[in-house]
Amino acid sequence: EGQTRVDHRNAGIVRLDGVECGAGAILGAPGAGAALLDEVVDRATVVLCGEMLGGMSQAFDLTLEYLKTRDQFGVKIGSFQGLQHRAANVFMEIELARSCVMAAARAVDAGAKDRSKLVSLAKARCSDAYVLAANEGVQIFGGVGMTDEYDIGFYMKRARASELTFGDAAFHRNRWATIGKY
């Protein structure tokens, strides 16, 4: 059953009612399903983190362009120190997220022992940074940021949906701590 999510992604619902599988239908070794599922979800999560990184970067670029072009009180709004500080904070969070995504992607590619921990770190950082970049963008754009005329509102929706996909930031911080035995 097909659906369109709030962030314009396509989604589907698969219903398996009354399905029975015989012993010959088992994929992989019996009892090894959880480890395989963890690996698949880690791979999917790091791919999502890459998409989130691209989205937050684009939201930030749109916001920077708006700061450079929007006039208020006879000057560009990007000249206001308070907005410069907000932009610098978003930039820092995006770069931290970028480093985490790159480390997680390398760990997934290498089949590293700390793969799951690095993936959870990346997802937690990306969730927080993407929501921050989108929220700050909407705040800086003002009311027009919520209209369909400006893409920043789309990135806010995408940030919220991506944040919840494969576990939110709190889930991944808890997973990171559990894996690290904290």
Put a short name on every predicted segment.
Residues 1-61, 65, 75, 170:
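FAD-binding core of flavoproteins
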Residues 36, 123-136:
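Short, hydrophobic/aliphatic alpha-helical segments
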Residues 64, 68-78, 91-125, 138-141, ...:
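C-terminal helix-coil-helix/basic helical segment that borders enzyme active sites and/or dimer interfaces
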Residues 43, 50, 81-91, 120-123, ...:
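Extended, low-aromatic, Leu/Ala- and acidic/polar-enriched alpha-helical coiled-coil segments
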Residues 141-182:
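Glycine-rich phosphate/cofactor-binding loops in nucleotide/flavin-utilizing enzymes
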Residues 106, 114, 130-156:
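A glycine-biased, small/acidic residue-tolerant capping/turn segment at secondary-structure junctions
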